[in-house]
Structures are given as C-alpha cells and as structure tokens.
C-alpha cells in the first residue's frame, strides 16, 4: 500500500525540508536536546497524528473505490451495550441473502506503534474489494468446499471470505489467519459472537496468527489443507515469495489455492512467475463471473475517477499443488 507520509532525513526537520506539517516552537524546543533517533520518532508522531491513518488511506488511489456492491451493510442489532472498540455491523449477501454474518469492523485509528512495529496493517483498515469478491465467489461456489479443510491467508480484521465458507458450505474445517495479532484478536471476537447465533455450518472454525515468512507458523500446518485462499495479498514485495512458499506447504497434494488480486502494475505477474518456479500449476481467469464482469465494464464506460482497473479489478488465479 502506498504511503503519503514523507519523513525528513537525519539532518533536517520537516519544516526545514519544506515538506509536511510545520512543528510549532514548543515542539521544536522539546526536540533540541533529544537523541537523533528520538527526534525522528517524535517527528513521525507529529506527521502521523495530523491525519488518522485509516482516514488518509481512503484518499489514496488504491482505496478510492470501495465496493463491487455484493454485500449490504447495516448496523448490527442488540449491540447498544458493546464497550469494545470497533463497530458491529451486519454483512448480508445481496445475491444470496440467506447468508448474513455479524462483523466487528475496526473503527479506531491505528497508533504509530501499530504502523512501525506490527506485521502488515493493510487488513486492519477496511474490507478491500478483492476480499469482497472472494467472499461472494465462495458463496456462489459453496459446493466446492464440501468435506474439505479450508484456510484463508491474510484475511485482515474480518476474514470475510473464510466466514462465508463457514456459514454456507458443508465444510470439514475452516481456519482464518492473518499475520497481524490485532487482526486475529478481532477475528476471534467475530467467531465467538457468531457461534452464539448458530450461523456456522461447521463446528471446526478457528483463527490464528500465521505469518507467511515464519517457518514455524507454516510448518505446524504443513500439508493440512485442501483449499487455501487469499485476496489482494500480492503487492508487498518482501512477502511475495514467502506467500508462494506458504501456499505450497500448507496444501495437500492436489490441493488448490484461490487467489484474487488486481494486477497492481507487475505484482500479479511477479507472483505468477514465483508460483510457476515453485512447481505450482496455474490457471488465470479475467472473466470468472458475469456479475463482476458487467459491473467492471459499467465502471470503465462511466469513466469514473475513483475506479482504476489496474488497482481495483481482481483477477482470479487458481494454483494446484501437483505431486
């Protein structure tokens, strides 16, 4: 994800560099005697506090387009006494309205510590369009998951797609994962809340922190899943190869991965190249659903300044572990 924050170099404050917000004299005075590392830290705090990160993300190009209109979102009932952070909402499929689930979305801002010290926070901000499309695809093709063990990787604060599998399919097991601990704490609360209402078709639904670059996390589940799926997880250069390796190791022989992601420059192709080198067979699909394709075409014809195919239209990649 792009960052709109520019941090001044070692030898200059942001005011001197002519960038970013000015720091008032009181703040400057408190910084003069501080070690250089502390100065940079306080400067970064000043910058990030000017605008909450989740609010700022709504204005960058990757977030201007928010939805393919596949789910309705309403305020969840009986949440008036909820004291926890985050707003509970009801997500209901527009085309399969019998499937609905209560979600706790992140409504608070991310702290500076979250940004600098936590594993990938992109999923803590919102439900991205690719996740929405994957969730819809899982509902439409719920028969594919019958009696299978399913894992969602990088599901963020809600793991919406994995939840849709758990409420619609006669699935053997569903594991919801993300590399961020804050995200998984939220997913745990979503699972616990919805178990009380009896919406899950499977009793074996759980969540855990799973970092693709952590060999221990992956090895504990090696060869366990029939289907692994993820949405819009390909654009971070430092994790792309690790994601390919994790998918291959988590899958059983002949297992499949469902990957939805926009092109985002060359990142989709780079992931495909890595997957081929790892020995996975590939099937790429651009027109995988008539509703999605029609909505995509409509947006392109309208010439909307909030929708950009390269950033927002998810392609479907099906990977198969051979041997």
UniProtKB/Swiss-Prot annotation:
One of its GO terms (biological process) is mitochondrion organization. This is Calmodulin-lysine N-methyltransferase. It catalyses: [calmodulin]-L-lysine + S-adenosyl-L-methionine = [calmodulin]-N(6)-methyl-L-lysine + S-adenosyl-L-homocysteine + H(+). Belongs to the class I-like SAM-binding methyltransferase superfamily. CLNMT methyltransferase family. Catalyzes the trimethylation of 'Lys-116' in calmodulin. It is found in: Cytoplasm; Nucleus. Monomer. Interacts with HSP90, probably as a client. One of its GO terms (molecular function) is heat shock protein binding. It is an enzyme of class 2 (transferase). One of its GO terms (cellular component) is nucleolus. Residues 1-29 are annotated as: Disordered. The keyword Transferase applies. InterPro entries: CaM-Lys-N-MeTrfase, Methyltransf_16, SAM-dependent_MTases_sf. Its EC number is 2.1.1.60. PANTHER family: CALMODULIN-LYSINE N-METHYLTRANSFERASE. Keywords: Cytoplasm, Methyltransferase, Nucleus, S-adenosyl-L-methionine, Transferase. Pfam families: Methyltransf_16.
């Amino acid at each position: 994800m792009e960052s709109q924050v520019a941090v001044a170099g070692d030898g200059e404050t942001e005011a001197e560099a002519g960038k970013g917000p000015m720091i008032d004299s009181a703040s400057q005075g408190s910084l003069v005697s501080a070690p250089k590392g502390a100065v940079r830290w306080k400067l970064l705090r000043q910058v990030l506090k000017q605008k909450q990160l989740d609010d700022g993300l709504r204005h960058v190009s990757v977030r201007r387009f928010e939805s393919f209109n596949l789910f309705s979102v309403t305020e969840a009932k009986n949440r008036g006494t909820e004291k926890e952070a985050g707003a509970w909402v009801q997500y209901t499929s527009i085309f399969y309205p019998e499937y609905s689930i209560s979600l706790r979305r992140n409504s608070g801002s991310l702290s500076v510590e979250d940004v600098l010290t936590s594993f990938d926070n992109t999923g803590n901000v919102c439900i991205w369009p690719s996740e929405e499309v994957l969730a819809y695809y899982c509902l439409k093709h719920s028969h594919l998951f019958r009696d299978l063990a399913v894992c969602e990787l990088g599901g963020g604060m809600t793991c919406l797609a994995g939840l849709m599998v758990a409420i619609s399919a006669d699935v053997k097991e569903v594991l919801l994962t993300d590399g961020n601990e804050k995200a998984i704490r939220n997913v745990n609360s979503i699972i616990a809340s919805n178990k009380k209402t009896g919406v899950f078709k499977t009793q074996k639904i759980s969540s855990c922190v799973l970092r693709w670059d952590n060999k221990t996390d992956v090895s504990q589940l090696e060869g366990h899943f029939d289907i692994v799926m993820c949405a819009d997880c390909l654009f971070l250069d430092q994790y792309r190869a690790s994601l390919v390796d994790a998918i291959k190791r988590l899958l059983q022989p002949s297992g499949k991965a469902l990957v939805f992601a926009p092109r985002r420059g060359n990142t989709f192709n780079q992931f495909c190249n890595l997957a081929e080198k790892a020995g996975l067979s590939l099937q790429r699909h651009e027109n995988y659903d008539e509703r999605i394709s029609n909505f995509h075409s409509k947006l392109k014809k309208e010439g909307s300044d909030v929708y950009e195919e390269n950033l927002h239209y998810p392609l479907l990649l099906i990977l198969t572990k051979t041997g």
